[in-house]
């Protein structure tokens, strides 16, 4: 968590939208959405609990049951949404390096991304609009500052950027520990590590 985004300092920031790239406590996300009163989108990180709901379709009123995850926030993992005039897609999780939720092999991440890619292509055919923002937890493969196996990132995220050229690809997962990390480019896409926090104008 970034101390600038807590308490009275939070009142100086007037965003149109808050995006979390994962690994932030759910109660903190709930705090942000209640204080800022703007939409908050998130993807789960490898240190987050599983947000995949169990199959409850057999239950009466299943649609009215609360979903896992922070209240008032929208999980965009493997989803395409339109918020604040932006078309935003999400791909959560990190490369599997131990047993735990929200960790995937490169092959698993590729399968998850294919479903997202199909939605993106269908939307683009229907209305001609392109993707504006890709939100991931892990960085696109080869674009992280860290080179250890847990942090090299997903090939699937890089492929989504190459195919859809969003204005922005925001990721987390790689902690800079006090350093200012450079903004990178993948074609026309700005690739930004948002840890610990960033205010970004589009």
Regions found by a protein language model. Name each.
Residues 1-4, 25-30, 46-53, 96-101, ...:
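Active-site environment of divalent metal-dependent phosphoester hydrolases
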Residues 5, 80-84, 160-164, 176-202:
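Binuclear metal-dependent phosphoesterase catalytic core
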Residues 17-23, 40-46, 76, 133-137, ...:
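Active-site neighborhood of phospho(di)ester-bond hydrolases with catalytic His/Asp-centered motifs
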Residues 1, 44-49, 55-152:
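Conserved catalytic scaffold of divalent metal-dependent phosphoesterases
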Residues 36-45, 152-157:
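A short, gly/pro- and small-residue-rich
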């Amino acid at each position: 968590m970034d101390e600038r985004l807590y308490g009275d300092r939070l009142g100086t920031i007037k965003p149109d939208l808050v995006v979390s790239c994962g690994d932030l406590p759910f109660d903190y996300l709930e705090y942000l959405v209640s204080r800022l009163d703007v939409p908050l989108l998130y993807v789960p990180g490898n240190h987050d609990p599983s947000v995949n709901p169990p199959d409850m379709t057999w239950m009466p009123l299943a649609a009215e049951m609360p979903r896992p995850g922070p209240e008032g926030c929208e999980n965009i993992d493997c989803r395409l949404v339109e918020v604040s005039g932006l078309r935003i897609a999400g791909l959560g999780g990190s490369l599997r390096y131990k047993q735990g939720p929200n960790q995937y092999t490169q092959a698993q991440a590729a399968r998850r991304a294919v479903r997202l890619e199909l939605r993106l292509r269908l939307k683009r055919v229907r209305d001609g609009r392109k993707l504006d923002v890709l939100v991931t937890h892990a960085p696109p493969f080869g674009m992280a500052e860290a080179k250890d196996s847990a942090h090299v990132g997903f090939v699937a995220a890089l492929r989504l950027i190459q195919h859809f050229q969003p204005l922005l690809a925001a990721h987390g997962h790689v902690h800079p520990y006090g350093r200012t990390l450079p903004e990178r480019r993948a074609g026309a896409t700005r690739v930004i590590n948002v840890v610990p926090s960033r205010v970004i104008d589009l």
